[in-house]
């Protein structure tokens, strides 16, 4: 029904109402038809990416698979690029991530994103093919760093939403953003991201946007937690599963992720907001 509505109305009335599709954009129900394209962008929830990839036709796969997912797979502990390489080894994997909301992209608002591909030549080609007058892409070969920035900022955004929802103030949010950024750097480095990986659109850029806008689903989810309100279970909140996956990986790496830990505890109703504040504020004093 959703697909038929999109074909008739030439817009996604459920997600992006009143924003018409470009004339060149076709709408197909056949996954094999979509997979026949040279470049395929995968804009599906992170926790559904593995299942979606298993449904892709194995014969004549796309030459390029570009993940637009932001998160860590809870079942495997892998990022999007690792899932792509495991399930579609004949395709060149890339990650498109950074500070953007779908409404801004659809409206043609000026936007800049990170395009990460381990193959530098493939990244150069994709950059040329996917750039538009309103979308500027910066390429990188640090795929791990790019996808971890996009994943972990969702966790920090939940914490910031809790802070504002609970009425703890903008100063508390700023502290969480700054210390959350350090947490992102520490975790990314432990998993092989390059130095300064978070000093990017996919790291600091996406963190800034997501932690300060109520357009962010993760921020809104945290805001509801802070107000002790129920959140619509039909709305995708990538940061919840990512926080759990990151915490499991951090335990293996013996990496301290205090903000991520309280986000997991809050999302599982194991602690109240006041307890979360006490846990973070009573940590041993340290040098910055």
Per-segment meaning from a language model:
Residues 1-19, 26-29:
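NAD(P)+-binding Rossmann beta1-loop-alpha1 motif at the extreme N-terminus of oxidoreductases
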Residues 8, 36, 278, 282:
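Phosphate-coordinating loops and pocket residues in cytosolic domains that bind phosphorylated ligands
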Residues 20-110, 126-128:
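Rossmann-like NAD(P)(H) cofactor-binding subdomain of soluble oxidoreductases
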Residues 70-72, 97-101, 119, 141-145, ...:
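Glycine-rich beta-alpha junction loops
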Residues 83-93, 110-197:
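Internal alpha-helical scaffold of NAD(P)-dependent oxidoreductase catalytic cores
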